[in-house]
Amino acid sequence: MMKKNVLVLIGSSLLSACITSPTGRSQFVFMPDAQVNQMGLDAFDTLKKEKKISNNSQYNQLASCISKAIVSEQAGSWEVVVFEDKSPNAFALPSNKIGVHTGMLTLVDNQDQLAAVIGHEVGHVLAKHSNERASQEMAVSQGMAMIQAIGSPQSALGQTAFGLLGVGAEYGVLMPYSRIQESEADIIGVDLMAKAGFDPRQSIGLWQKMEQASQGQQPIEFLSTHPANATRIQSYEKQCSV
């Protein structure tokens, strides 16, 4: 009876946390936005303290100008910081924070490709992917703890089954959602850059360059939190042809 009541409680909590993303996908999000935004703010402040901030006026102006265009229709103000880091990377955090590595600025061929990167990262924020990811992690960890406490598997078979549940939670629940989030951010990013006046077809060139930069060294896609670059390129080509 207790097990049934707990499962009903878990089920009702899951239903109340369901929302819809900007692309129409159902999401599981139950953490308060204020809490997630504070986490993003704290993380960004830490990065600014620990990483060297670029003084290159050209880099800063380019990143700021493109970011401003991408988020022009979004509410609130956005902070953009260029970090001295040779790795080709960029990110956006809850609380409207955007970070761009100098390595990304040297990799892209033009402002449209940089707009594709920033649009993608802003897409993560608009779709509340950080909240979704944190909610998933919390739900899985709490749910597994409750199931373990209720079931109390003592046999070797029971322990093995629970171990498999852990593997399933790792690669069957959490990992795939990350790939879905990345693909969704791609879709949102292309829409943002197109609305801002940039050429969305340049997103294809961007990921071709990213694939060349990776020199073919990628994890197997099934165990990766990001789609393979070749998969991304195919998706962009399909979206840009519509």
Which role fits each region the language model picked out?
Residues 1-2:
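N-terminal secretory signal peptides that target proteins for export/translocation
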Residues 5-6, 18-242:
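A Zn2+-metalloprotease active-site environment signal
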